[in-house]
Each structure stands twice: as structure tokens, then as C-alpha cells.
Amino acid sequence: MAKDLQVLTALDVAKTQLYHFTAIVIAGMGFFTDAYDLFCISLVTKLLGRIYYHHEGALKPGSLPPNVAAAVNGVAFCGTLAGQLFFGWLGDKLGRKKVYGMTLMLMVICSIASGLSFGHTPKSVMATLCFFRFWLGFGIGGDYPLSATIMSEYANKKTRGAFIAAVFAMQGFGILAGGMVAIIVSAAFKNQFPAPAYKDGALASTISQADFVWRIIVMFGAIPTALTYYWRMKMPETARYTALVAKNLKQATNDMSKVLQVEIEPEQEKVEEISQGNDFGLFTKQFLRRHGLHLLGTASTWFLLDIAFYSQNLFQKDIFSAIGWIPPAETMNALEEVYRIARAQTLIALCSTVPGYWFTVAFIDKIGRFAIQLMGFFFMTVFMFALAIPYTHWTHKDNRIGFVIMYSLTFFFANFGPNATTFVVPAEIFPARLRSTCHGISAAAGKAGAMVGAFGFLYAAQSTDPKKTDAGYPAGIGVRNSLIVLGCVNFLGMLFTLLVPESKGKSLEEMSRENEGEDENGTEMRASGRTVPV
């Protein structure tokens, strides 16, 4: 059976080597682009409003209408969700490596095309941008299940969690790169082409060269991704796919002998034994009996986490304005606004978002996925309620720094918590022939939650007083009530975490139970040791 295969045992016990770190960089570049893209578009939406939606004589600079802003920011989410489902399924059908190249090329081409969006009217430019951002998201979506699956199937038992989490943590570098590129490009153009503040010269405050600024920022994300294409194509197919799905033990042994630089026996006679009792499909009775609750656990926790995680971005504008990092829009020119927004968001990322990722990498194989996820949801719940219940206290000028610290801590415990573990666990607990598909389903549930968080709460967080809402938005339930709802969402995440098994220190075959067969009566032979914490 699978547990007897020397090639898989060799991978499980292999010492940490150069190929592990090479795999992290190659797989992580997709997440670098993912974070860069989602982050950089939020830096340039204000600029897009000034360029394409300027109204003569208006007291404030132009801004994207709510429906256009939602489309520009949200269309990539829709593409990502579709890509996660499609490429997740395709990765199990055709193999990880074949599909991996497709997703990367799609990301590179659509990143560049997004920056070349054209049209005679503002509406046509935004429509072209949205079209290419959907397909960019589609490619990024494919990277989620494939990168996680490839890293989990290459890693050893001892440090597998840290390696998969490190791939995901490349998002942190993508966020920082997005901020730094926006700062450098906007500063360079600002110095070269001085312009007055909006209140001193409405039309002159947005220079014609500003149109190049957002295009350069959007396109830059394609460069590091394109550089890894060669190495992606050089990676051999994972041994677990070749042996357990394609049933080609000889090829798997040859590939891993080169990678690990050790002699491994082919064991071709075990091919039939591998699949005995492990040929059930997705959503069959046997799948639901073995993995149904696990899939519910991974999908629901990712869904709930992303509602809370992506809705937190809604409060950034209030925070930045409150602490004076971003002055009123009319007191700045277009490029000054890009510079200020990029600087503020990069500082928040540097102080709270990025450290959280690497705390997970450091501790995931020491204290386990289950403990980190439960702890993360717990502290996110605590901090959300701590912000919500005395909300009027935090709005006073003297308490604003405290509000920023509390806000930063929710981001920290999202990343040193469920934001990382919801990505890691689905790559470890499902059978090889369904691993990529199940990870894609879990990730797609997460993106559905992201859409609820980013857009549902964009409307919900509006003031209950119609006179105080943002332009174009109806009255909502207010920020305080929104924070209370988000606290409840995080608490639900804690409860659904109880469905997620602990995979620390176990092989993929132990977790997926591919090292079990069926006896002559067709009943399952269960491996010793429970997987679900109680």
C-alpha cells in the first residue's frame, strides 16, 4: 500500500534541502502576484476616479461611482473563485505540473493587459480593465490549489506545515512590493511633474502623465512571475501524483531519485495494491463518510475567515484619516494622494500583516494547525468585540492610537491564525487524486466569503443616517454594528474549526487514509489514531 512505497517514505523523511526552498520560491511567486494585484488596485482606485470621473466645478476630486469601484475591486475575486474550482479540478485530472504553467502564463499576460486597458470613454476603459482583471483572477485562482498541493507533496513530514505556510507568506512580500512600487513611481512622477493641490487648481492637480502611473503600478506585478516560468517548467511532476494517481511508479522513482539524490527501488509490482479500496470519487458515499466533515470544516472556516479578513480593509480609510496619515483629498494633488495612501497601507502591512505570516511559519510545526487556527479566531473575536462595544470611546481623538493598535492586532492574529492555516490544511488531509480539487473547493468558499466581506460590509458599514453615508451608498447598519456582526462571524469560525483535523507530524497518506485498504467484506480497515480534535 501507499505507506510501503519507498519513494513516498523517502520524501517524508528527507532532510530540508535546497530543492525545498526552490519549490517555496517557485510556488510562492503566484501568491506574490496575487497579493500585489489585489493590493495595488486599492492604491490606484482614487487616482482612477480623479482621471476618469472629474466633474468641472466640484468641491472634491472625482471618484469612482460605487458600482464601478465594486466592479474594479471585485471582478478579480470572481475570477479567482472560478479559477480555484476549474484549475483545482484540472490539477487532479492532468497533473499539477501541466496546469501550473497555464496559470502562470495567464497571470503574466493579463497583468500586462490590465495596464494597457483602453477606450474612448471612462466606461470603456473601466470595462476593459475589468475584463482583463477577471482573467487575471482566474489564473491566480488556479495557483491556490496547485501551489499548496505541489508544496505539500514535495515536503517532508517534519516541516511540511512551515513550507506550505511559507508559500502563502509570499503574499506578504507581494503586499510590500505593491506599496513600494506605488511609492517609488508616484514620488518619481510627482518630483518630475509638480502640480497644485485640488483646491488650488482642480484640473491642474491631475497631470496628464498620471495616466501612466496607475498603468506602470498594475503591470509591474507580471515581472517577478514571468521570471519563474522557466523554473516552473523544469520542476518534475510530484511523486504522489505520478505514483498514486497516474500509477507510474517507475517515473515517480526516477524523478525523486534525481531530486533527492538517493537510490530508490521502483517497486512496480505495488501499483495495483495502491489503488485497492481507494478509487472512490468526489461526493460519493465513501468520500462523505471519510472526508465529508473535513471538507465542510475547511470550506466553512475559510469562508468565515475571509468575511472578517476582507471587511477589515473597509475601516482603513477612517483610521488613516483619523491619525492624519491621509489628509482630505482636496488638499492634495493626484500623485500626492497615491503616495500617501501607499505609504500608509505599507506601514500597516509591515507592522501587522507580514509578521503574522512568519509567526505561522515559525510555529505551525511546533504547536500545530488546529491550535493556531483556534487561537487566531479567538483573538480576532476578542478584538472585534473590544473595538465594537465601546466604539464611541475609540472615536475620540485621544484614543485613536489605541484603535490603530487594536485594529493591527486583528490583522496580526488573522495571519498568525486562520488566514494561513485555512490554506495549509486542505493540502494535507485529502487523497492525492482529489487533493487539488478539494483545496480548490475550500479556497473558492473563502473567495465567496471575501466578496461578502469586501462588498456586503461596504454597504453594511455605512452610517444609519442617510445624510452621512458615502456618495452613492444607501444607509447601512453603521460601523459599530458591523464590527459586532464580524465578531460573531469569527466566533462561528472557532466552532467550525472543531471539524478540522490536526495534521502535524503525519504523512499525507495517514491523513488522507490512502494507507488503508478494504478487507474482503468491503469494510474499511481504519488506521490507528484519531484525526479530529475533540
From Swiss-Prot:
It holds the Pfam family Sugar_tr. Keywords: Cell membrane, Ethylene signaling pathway, Membrane, Phosphate transport, Symport, Transmembrane, Transmembrane helix, Transport. It is a multi-pass membrane protein. It catalyses: phosphate(in) + H(+)(in) = phosphate(out) + H(+)(out). This is Low affinity inorganic phosphate transporter 1. PANTHER family: SOLUTE CARRIER FAMILY 22 MEMBER. Although related to the sugar transporter family, it does not transport sugars. The keyword Transmembrane helix applies. One of its GO terms (cellular component) is plasma membrane. InterPro entries: MFS_dom, MFS_sugar_transport-like, MFS_trans_sf, Phos_permease. Induction: By ethylene during corolla senescence. Belongs to the major facilitator superfamily. Phosphate:H(+) symporter (TC 2.A.1.9) family. GO terms for biological process: ethylene-activated signaling pathway; floral organ senescence; phosphate ion transport; response to ethylene. GO terms for molecular function: phosphate transmembrane transporter activity; symporter activity. The keyword Ligase does not apply. Low-affinity transporter for external inorganic phosphate (Pi). Involved in phosphorus (P) remobilization from dying to developing tissues during corolla senescence in an ethylene-dependent manner. Residues 1-23, 91-98, 146-163, 232-290, 365-369, 422-440, 503-534 are cytoplasmic. It is found in: Cell membrane. The chain crosses the membrane at residues 24-44, 70-90, 99-119, 125-145, 164-184, 211-231, 291-311, 344-364, 370-390, 401-421, 441-461, 482-502. It comes from Petunia hybrida (Petunia). Residues 45-69, 120-124, 185-210, 312-343, 391-400, 462-481 are extracellular. Residues 507-534 are annotated as: Disordered.
